[in-house]
């Protein structure tokens, strides 16, 4: 059966969720909580982009993605840096 899938995106920049690649307006200070919210609201999958610019930020983003994965039950796809 074919059906449409709801796949929200979280863009992580400096440990926070921002609006878009070129719009760094903060949507949430807690990306883990945001991922859980999307999961609980019925998303089919979660797409996460790491917009970090340094190795330190990248390592922090990876840690956040691991934490996100622990609190959601839907598949997560990640990309970026």
Model-predicted segments: where are they?
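Conserved N-terminal beta1-alpha1 strand-loop-helix module at the mouth
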Residues: 1-72
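Glycine-rich beta-to-alpha transition loops that act as phosphate-gripper elements at the mouths
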Residues: 74-81
């Amino acid at each position: 059966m074919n059906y449409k899938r709801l796949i929200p995106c979280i863009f992580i920049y400096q440990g926070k969720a921002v609006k878009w690649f070129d719009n760094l307006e903060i949507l949430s200070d807690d990306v883990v909580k945001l991922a859980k919210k999307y999961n609980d609201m019925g998303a089919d999958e979660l797409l996460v982009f790491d917009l970090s610019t340094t190795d330190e930020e990248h390592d922090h983003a990876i840690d956040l993605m691991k934490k996100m994965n622990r609190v959601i039950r839907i598949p997560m796809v990640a990309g970026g840096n």
